Swiss-Prot record:
Function (record text): Phosphorolytic 3'-5' exoribonuclease that plays an important role in tRNA 3'-end maturation. Removes nucleotide residues following the 3'-CCA terminus of tRNAs; can also add nucleotides to the ends of RNA molecules by using nucleoside diphosphates as substrates, but this may not be physiologically important. Probably plays a role in initiation of 16S rRNA degradation (leading to ribosome degradation) during starvation.
KW tRNA processing (keyword) present: yes
Residues spanning the membrane: none
Record's subunit section: Homohexameric ring arranged as a trimer of dimers.
Enzyme class: transferase
UniProt EC number: 2.7.7.56
Name the UniProt record assigns to this protein: Ribonuclease PH
Organism: Burkholderia ambifaria (strain ATCC BAA-244 / DSM 16087 / CCUG 44356 / LMG 19182 / AMMD)
Domain of life: Bacteria
NCBIfam families listed in its UniProt record: RNasePH (TIGR01966)
Keyword flag Lipid biosynthesis: no
Length: 246
């Protein structure tokens, strides 16, 4: 590894971008958060519906599902809305399924009861790491939605069992890096997205060699970086939620 590598962002190899979680960002949703990872900005909302999908009818449990999308000019050039095209891209479907899986990993769906939490993640500005930012922000939005259910007497206890957060890591010019922005992500040798719980359990690891295969040692270094970064994100979630969080 090259210790003298200069990242395009000027950050250390193990340094997150500036991360902010702004709660109660919109008026109507039971939970809403603006999550910012540097120049990546995503609005995450959590909406509660007192019903479940047909496949869960009469099974005594709830459900959590997610949708993901990007504003037409969230990136350097404008993209048509997927609604105008008539279908979602494979990337969109993959990301929203990932967000749903990540949050369900820390929900006791039986304790949630026969209701659904709908997570919506809308990228208003993209500079790399939109899916991981979405997961990190969506957890806080879902937590606030659950708090409202408890306050309304609809839940006796929280169905949330742990925190969950996510981060990107990658190998850039031979050096493992934490929290890739677009300039790094578009040129990295290896790209990996990692989702973990507050207790340190892995929910998902998505890793791809963009050109040169990566070694087991590099994979271990990337996972160590991800674990460190996610630990910082979980602490930020706890800080913004304050007393009464998981």
């Amino acid at each position: 590894m090259t210790s003298s590598l200069s990242r395009p962002s000027g950050r250390r190899a193990d340094e997150l971008r500036k991360v902010a979680l702004t709660r109660h960002y919109t008026k109507h949703a039971e939970g809403s958060v603006l999550v910012e990872f540097g120049d990546t900005k995503v609005i995450c909302t959590a909406s509660v519906a007192e019903r479940v999908p047909e496949f869960l009818r009469d099974r005594g449990q709830g459900w959590l599902t997610a949708e993901y999308g990007m504003l037409p000019r969230a990136t350097h050039t404008r993209s048509d809305r997927e609604a105008a095209r008539g279908k979602q891209t494979g990337r969109t479907q993959e990301i929203q399924r990932l967000i749903g899986r990540a949050l369900r990993a820390v929900f006791d769906l039986e304790a949630l009861g026969p209701r659904t939490i709908h997570i919506d993640c809308d990228v208003i500005q993209a500079d790399g790491g939109t899916r991981t930012a979405s997961i990190t922000g969506a957890f806080v939005a879902a937590h606030d939605a659950v708090s409202k259910l408890i306050a309304a007497g609809k839940l006796a206890r929280s169905p949330i069992t742990d925190h969950v957060a996510a981060i990107s890591v990658g190998v850039y010019e031979g050096v493992p890096l934490l929290d890739l922005d677009y300039a790094e992500d578009s040129r990295c040798d290896t790209d990996m997205n990692v989702v973990m719980t507050g207790a340190g359990g892995f929910v998902e690891v998505q890793g791809t060699a963009e050109g040169v295969p990566f070694s087991r040692a590099e994979m271990n270094a990337l996972l160590d970086l991800a674990q460190s970064g996610i630990g910082q994100l979980v602490q930020l979630q706890k800080d913004v939620l304050g007393a009464g969080n998981v």
